[in-house]
């Protein structure tokens, strides 16, 4: 288990939690003073009231909650959102309402989940040619349905 330091930005903030022993993500809660009405086909930035610190071997990914997506057509817009190891500001979640009905966000509503994920850094090596593959340059549906 990797250690993540967490700072409450107000005493009444609810800390993220794993809801089951098998959960890979901790639920993030909205920390808002007034209800947010998320209109259809619109986005909003929802504060969580927390900031974190962790090893640079990791990132935290912010992902949608499947229940919000399936039942309310609401998801995290920049999925997955990335919290870099050197970011110390408040975690905020960009929610998007894909549906046709308004979506109400109240304080302490579970709005997303965060997952600690290992990061493997790339070493780029410039080249004039790349190795051939069967697929080649085919993309965007080139392998069939």
Residue spans of the language-model regions?
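DUTPase catalytic domain/fold
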Residues: 1-145
